[in-house]
Structure formats: structure tokens, C-alpha cells
Regions:
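Sec-dependent signal peptide cleavage junction
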Residues: 20-40
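Aromatic-lined substrate-binding rim segments of carbohydrate-active enzymes
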Residues: 85-162, 251-273
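Active-site-adjacent "subsite" loops/lids of carbohydrate-active enzymes
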Residues: 124, 145-203
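Aromatic-lined carbohydrate-recognition surfaces of secreted/lumenal glycan-active proteins
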Residues: 141-143, 207-222, 250-288, 303-304, ...
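Aromatic- and acid-rich polysaccharide-binding/catalytic face
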Residues: 215, 221, 232-248, 285-313
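Aromatic- and carboxylate-lined catalytic core of secreted/periplasmic carbohydrate-active enzymes
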Residues: 344-484, 496
């Protein structure tokens, strides 16, 4: 009954907000105009699709998309370090050099609506231009009313009008930060308008650019932190101050807000996949709430900010996020610390488990570390204007992660569509690859024996009558349980076309790769089915 009541309430609230949104004023990118163009049916840029075997994947412009991203904290660089919008370009180049396919960009409400009904998307357009220049797609992170359980990024007119936009009494002493009543109709109306205008501006920009650069939207950021931690941490009270807000009350309004804003994106003229990142999906005490998010009409997929450096834990998260009540979800690591030395193994393991991976972050703003006491979480050394020798340099583990991402990117079409049991990862038993490793893994039809003396991480994918191989460093693959021919080197395009750039010798089913080579081999025949051991050889 409680869930049914919540759904009915959410539906009524969503209808009210959408009615208000359609009746309110709007403006275009970089303009201050209260005229709103008539809403159109728009277009669907991305969606969650499924293979015949039921594997979920992200489809962009009709093609499978490899979900490999890195977050760029443009808010930290611009707000706290006072870097210019033009200086943000260097971080996009770094992302492209890391071989990720997309970047996650925080979009703060106060930046796109500095004054009530006055919208400014010029910086958003600049950022999309940088992404397009370096061949990257973009996921927008909506930093609005719930950012890690609170908000300090709402426009001043929201923050200064507690009567119209109520916030809960608490022990917070910073007047610029608030615990808003997230499902308050007045607040949701304004937030919905801002998101609607944002998506309209994105649609206009992408139409002019001739490319759909934005492919997903994250609704809020770690919204579960509000009921999980903030209530007790800051003694958050009901609006009348008579008692503490319960975690269930907090959870219900969090769900309602997520659903409403997600629907705004999905009903916009530029329709993309919506997702939510949770802080605690793998925590047994709270995982029961994750399916509630997944069930929301406005949210397509749910990921977890694992912040864990072990392969086995990240593997388990992928399994939990794609089974039981979450069957059909696209499992993904929504954030994981880029500074982990095991990053390369973590990334490969997650992709072998059928998931996606977002690095948090590409490079950590200096002010976060020096002034705020944050850990350096970047996969690249933080920018240090005082010491050019350490300015945006690799960490010891960066190159191996870059190599893994190269393979994932250039074999992404096959990895995205292949069943998990037909993606064999090698040298992934531990958190770090062993320098010398020999390992045999069965897929559903091909047995592969892998060996390296150079600490290579590697994978093999069986799909559609072909076997795709990749290793970060020199390695040998010996194939059995069938006959094989035509070992070609090259890469897969976004439409699945394999473009050959050379060939490699194959003798008695054995192929030696130098490293950083994607190899496709024809499977002429197999000697019957095998029981896959791919999953058990991870972690």
C-alpha cells in the first residue's frame, strides 16, 4: 500500500509540475527571453536496448555505445579555482587521451538560471563544443536540489525564499546550503523548468552542430545520502520543527523528485537515457531501496559509486545491479576513484561483467585537495600551476588503465553485445595483474589459453562467428575446441564494421600479439558447447 500510495502521489505531482512547466516562460541558449516555443515531439537520442539474450546496453543514435567515462569537475575548476571556460578545453583533451568515450559534466542550477526566468547556456554550449572537438560524448550531471544529500547550488531566488521553497530545519550553519523539501510543488516546478530549458538548449546546439553530443543525464547526485546519512549527521527536522524527519519520509520525497525530474528529461524535445548514482547500492542494509529507484518511470538505469579498489567487490556490484529486482538494469560503476592503483583491473573486470565504468575523477581540482582536504581522486595528477613539472602528468597506474580503455573502446561493439559468459578476462584473479601469468578460460564454445611475461591484461570475446582478442602488452592466445582462421588486426566502428589494418600469423590455433592490438579471428567450427568459466576467473 505504501508503494502504491507513493506512486499515485508521484503521478499526480508529476502531472502538476508538467502542466506548470508547459505554461511557464523559457529562453534559448545565451538569451533572456520569456517566450517559450511550442513543445515538439522531439527525438530520441539514446535508450536502453537489449540483445536477444536479454543483455542490457546503451544505444546511441541506433548503435551500441561503449559506456566508458570520466568525470570533469568543471564546477571546482571554475567556481573555486576561477579558471575560465576556455581553460576547460585542456581537460577534454586529457579525457580523449585516456581513451574514454564520454565525459560527465556537473551542471549547477545556479549557473544556468542565475536569475529567475533568466537562463544562460553559453558555457554549456562551449563545453559541448570541446567534447565534439575531441570525439567525446557527454553525460550531464544535474546538480540541483540533491547533491550528496543537500544543495548549495540552487539559484539565489530559491535559497532566499524559504516560504515559497521550504527547507528543513537542521544543524547546518552555512546559510548557502540547505535541505530542501525536494517534492515541494513550487520547488519542483522551478527545477523542472530549468531542466526543460536545458534540454531545449541542448537540442538546439546539437542540431546546429550536426551531432548528438549529449547522450545521458544523471538526475541529482548520490541522492540516497539524504536519508542514509544527512538526517542524523545534521539533525534534520520536519518543517514545523516538532521532530526529526524519518528516513522513510526522506526516501519517499527523494524518489518523487527523481521521478519527476527524470520525466522532464524523457518528455523533452531531446530524449536521452536517465540514470541515478547511489552511494550504497552494495550495502545490504540499503540495497532494497535501489529497485525502487529502478522502478521509477522517469529513471532508466541505476549505478553505484563503489569507491572500492578490489576486483571482487566491483564484480559483485555488477552482479547485484543486474539480477533479481534489478534484472534488465544496465549495471555500471557510476563513480570509482581514479587514484586507485588497481584501476586498470577494475575497469576491465567491470566491462567483462557486462557493465559500464565512470572514473571519478579525471583530474582533481587543486583546491579540493589543498583547501578542502579531499583525497586526490584523479587518474591523472592534479593541475598544479606552481609546479609545471607535475602539471597534468600520468600517475604510475595511468598508462595501464589507458591501455585497457583503448582495447575496450576499439572492441566496444563486440564487448557491448556479447553475453557475459562469452567475454573472457585474463590476469584478473587479483587486484593487480601478475607479471607472469598463464590461464585457461572457457567461453560457451571456445577454450582460450592465455600467457604473458609482461604483466598484460587481456580479453577475448566470442560473438557472431568471430573471436576478438586484445592485450595491453605482449601475450599469446591459444585457441581450442574448434577450428579458426584469418587473424586480422584492426578496430570496430560504432556500427560494428571491423576495419582491418593488417594481419597476424596463426599456427595451430596460437596467436601472439604485441600489445595494444585488437585482433579478429574467424571461428570456422566448434566441437560442441562448453560450460563458461569466464565469470569465475574474475576476482
Amino acid at each position: 500500500m505504501k508503494k502504491m500510495f507513493r506512486r499515485v502521489l508521484t503521478l499526480l505531482l508529476s502531472v502538476f509540475v508538467l502542466f506548470c512547466a508547459l505554461a511557464a516562460a523559457a529562453c534559448g541558449p545565451g538569451e533572456e527571453d520569456k517566450e517559450k516555443p511550442t513543445p515538439s515531439e522531439g527525438k530520441t537520442v539514446s535508450r536502453i536496448a537489449y540483445t536477444d539474450a536479454g543483455k542490457a546496453y546503451l544505444e546511441v543514435d541506433g548503435n551500441p555505445f561503449t559506456y566508458a567515462g570520466a568525470q570533469i569537475r568543471i564546477d571546482g575548476f571554475m567556481d573555486e579555482e576561477h579558471q575560465s571556460i576556455d581553460e576547460m578545453e585542456r581537460y577534454f583533451k586529457l579525457a580523449a587521451d585516456m581513451n574514454v568515450t564520454m565525459v560527465e559534466l556537473p551542471i549547477q542550477w545556479k549557473d544556468i538560471e542565475p536569475e529567475k526566468d533568466q537562463y544562460d547556456f553559453r558555457n554549456v554550449g562551449k563545453l559541448l563544443g570541446f567534447a565534439q572537438k575531441y570525439g567525446l560524448k557527454v553525460e550531464l550531471l544535474l546538480f540541483t536540489v540533491n547533491v550528496c544529500g543537500m544543495s548549495g547550488v540552487a539559484p539565489n531566488y530559491i535559497n532566499q525564499d524559504a516560504k515559497t521553497y521550504p527547507r528543513y530545519p537542521s544543524d547546518l550553519t552555512d546559510s548557502t546550503v540547505a535541505f530542501y523539501e525536494q517534492d515541494n510543488p513550487n520547488l519542483l516546478e522551478r527545477e523542472s523548468l530549468a531542466v526543460e530549458h536545458l534540454m531545449s538548449a541542448v537540442a538546439d546546439w546539437c542540431e546546429v552542430a550536426g551531432e548528438n553530443v549529449v547522450i545521458a543525464v544523471q538526475v541529482h547526485n548520490e541522492p540516497d545520502v539524504f536519508p542514509l546519512w544527512r538526517l542524523q549527521q545534521y539533525n534534520v527536522m520536519t518543517l514545523d520543527g516538532s521532530r526529526r524527519l524519518t528516513d522513510m519520509e526522506a526516501w519517499e520525497e527523494t524518489l518523487a523528485a527523481l521521478d519527476t525530474i527524470g520525466k522532464v528529461v524523457k518528455n523533452s524535445e531531446y530524449k536521452v537515457v536517465t540514470r541515478v548514482n547511489t552511494a550504497i547500492a552494495w550495502d545490504a542494509a540499503w540495497e532494497a531501496f535501489v529497485p525502487d529507484i529502478y522502478e521509477l518511470e522517469g529513471i532508466d538505469i541505476v549505478g553505484d559509486d563503489t569507491y572500492n579498489e578490489t576486483v571482487s567487490v566491483n564484480k559483485e556490484v555488477m552482479q547485484n545491479l543486474s539480477s533479481g529486482d534489478l534484472a534488465g538494469n544496465l549495471p555500471h560503476v557510476a563513480e570509482n576513484r581514479g587514484s586507485y592503483g588497481s584501476s586498470a583491473s577494475l575497469i576491465l573486470a567491470v566491462f567483462c561483467m557486462g557493465g559500464g565504468y565512470d572514473i571519478y575523477d579525471l583530474i582533481t581540482p587543486k583546491v579540493f585537495i589543498e583547501d578542502w582536504g579531499w583525497v586526490d581522486e584523479g587518474i591523472i595528477y592534479s593541475y598544479d600551476e606552481d609546479d609545471p613539472s607535475t602539471s597534468m602528468k600520468d600517475k604510475p597506474h595511468t598508462d595501464l588503465a589507458r591501455r585497457v580503455l583503448y582495447g575496450v573502446k576499439n572492441a566496444g561493439y563486440e564487448m557491448t553485445l556479447a553475453p557475459v559468459g562469452d567475454i573472457a578476462g585474463f590476469n584478473l584473479k587479483g587486484n593487480y595483474p601478475e607479471t607472469s601469468c598463464e590461464q585457461t578460460v572457457d567461453t560457451s564454445s571456445v577454450r582460450i589459453t592465455f600467457s604473458t611475461r609482461e604483466g598484460a591484461l587481456a580479453f577475448a570475446i566470442v560473438r557472431g562467428g568471430y573471436l576478438t582478442l586484445f592485450s595491453t602488452h605482449a601475450a599469446q592466445f591459444t585457441l581450442s575446441n574448434g577450428t579458426f582462421s584469418g587473424a586480422e588486426l584492426g578496430a570496430y566502428g560504432t556500427d560494428g564494421t571491423f576495419t582491418a589494418s593488417g594481419s597476424v600469423a596463426m599456427s595451430d590455433g596460437s596467436v601472439s600479439l604485441e600489445g595494444m592490438q585488437v585482433c579478429r579471428i574467424k571461428i570456422d567450427s566448434t566441437d560442441g558447447s562448453l560450460t563458461s568459466t569466464a565469470v569465475e576467473n574474475i576476482g
